[in-house]
Amino acid sequence: MKFARFEINGWQSYGVVDGDHLRVIQGDIFGTHHFTDARYPISSVKILPPTMPKSFWAVGLNYADHVAHQVENLDAGFVSEAQEFRPWQKGVSCIIGQGETIVLPKESDYVHYEGELVIVIGKPARRVTPEEAPHFIMGYTCANDVSSEGSWHDDPSNWRKKTSDTFGPVGPWIETDLDPQGVEIITRVNGKETDRGSTSGMTFNCYETVSRISEFVTLHPGDLILTGAPGAVEG
């Protein structure tokens, strides 16, 4: 099932994708809700980010092939870091929906993109095991983890590099019936394929990721977790 958040004539709601239409949902998609008879053509609505989360997490260096593409120009410490679980947060204010414009900061020298699978949390999660994690995940969506480089290249924080306004396109919807263990991820720019990989190459899979973050932080319904980019990263 695919859940989409949308807007039409200034009114916002959730709907379930039914062919080329959205069937309107009444209630809380993370709690009690039901499907109504109201339907809108997808082409007639504005698709919004699937959630507006309390937190927007990300896992860095989570694919061996991604690390391999960069390791020639980096020191051995980079490889060591790639073997550790290193989550970080992207600012929720950077989130935009499908088709919205990514604004490039005038101060940046270089901007690049990373197509990633995103975990959507469905229930409050605290200290869950990897085996329990699927019960706390509502589904999955897609995101472009946009990054920029500039005079802040050596700044170890990501606040300028990763969290500028519009640097978090997410969507278009939440897929609830996806097995995350072997998903093919294809990134295209202007129709041209620039990267291809599989979630089977993750160092820390989706269930391990939820478990590890929830050891120290409560995850809430609607929270998003970027799971890393496979393959190379081109500008």
Question: How would you describe each model-predicted region?
Answer:
Residues 46-48, 75-77, 102-111, 125-132, ...:
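A generic local secondary-structure boundary/capping motif
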Residues 46-50, 66, 149-235:
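Catalytic-pocket segment enriched in acidic/His residues
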Residues 75-97, 113:
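Structural signature of FAD isoalloxazine-binding scaffolds in flavoprotein oxidoreductases
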Residues 9-11, 63, 124-126, 230-234:
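Short, charged beta-turn/beta-strand-edge "cap" motif at the junction between a beta-strand
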